[in-house]
Amino acid sequence: MVEKKPNLTLEFHDYLALKKVLFDWADSYDAKDWDRLRSIIAPTLTVDYRQIGLRKWDDMPAEDYMAMISDMDFLGDPTVKTQHLLGESWWEKISDTEVIGHHQLRAAHQVYTDSTLQTVKLKGHGHATNEHYYRKVDGVWKFAGLKPTVRWNEYQFEDVFRAAKPSV
């Protein structure tokens, strides 16, 4: 069987616009800048979180995505600090309005005991490759979803978001 080769042809201005969306995605997560994140996402997203214990949503409305990401039990918790560090990427053109980005990612997480951010409660870092989906909406590239593939985790990654919740 002959493997189909990906279409690697992108116009340079599209490449630069996609790189900016990628940077804004990661940095808005880390800065908890929900307005910036909202400005770069498509009206609907494909979110495949099966590898991290959740489910797949094929047509998640933008506001549902924003609510999930910014929730106090997820990235919205002020005691959870992150850095989504991007490694190498390659880009697959699906059509003039759709691109899949393949990105190496290290997501460092630290959970603090309280909002003073003085004492680290635990840390957990994820190492993954992500498929990011990009869609051109009204002539502008938007983030349209993701599918992480976890390679390995460090420390107590599985406890990061549970640990941020008050003990019962």
Swiss-Prot record:
Keywords assigned by UniProt, alphabetized: Conidiation, Endosome, Lyase, Sporulation
Pathway this chain belongs to: Pigment biosynthesis; melanin biosynthesis
An example molecular function term from Gene Ontology annotations: scytalone dehydratase activity
Activation/inhibition comment: Fenoxanil inhibits arp1 scytalone dehydratase activity.
Residue positions of the active site: 84, 109
Enzyme's top EC category: lyase
Record has Lyase as a keyword: yes
Residue sites binding substrate per the record: 29, 49, 130
Cell location: Endosome
Physiological role: Scytalone dehydratase; part of the gene cluster that mediates the biosynthesis of dihydroxynaphthalene (DHN)-melanin, a bluish-green pigment and a structural component of the conidial wall. The first step of the pathway is the production of the heptaketide naphtopyrone YWA1 by the polyketide synthase alb1 though condensation of acetyl-CoA with malonyl-CoA. The naphtopyrone YWA1 is then converted to the pentaketide 1,3,6,8-tetrahydroxynaphthalene (1,3,6,8-THN) by the heptaketide hydrolyase ayg1 though chain-length shortening.
Subunit structure: Homotrimer. Each subunit contains an active site, located in the central part of the hydrophobic core of the monomer, which functions independently.
Sequence similarity: Belongs to the scytalone dehydratase family.
The name this protein goes by in its record: Scytalone dehydratase arp1
Organism per entry: Aspergillus fumigatus (strain ATCC MYA-4609 / CBS 101355 / FGSC A1100 / Af293) (Neosartorya fumigata)
Gene this chain is encoded by: arp1
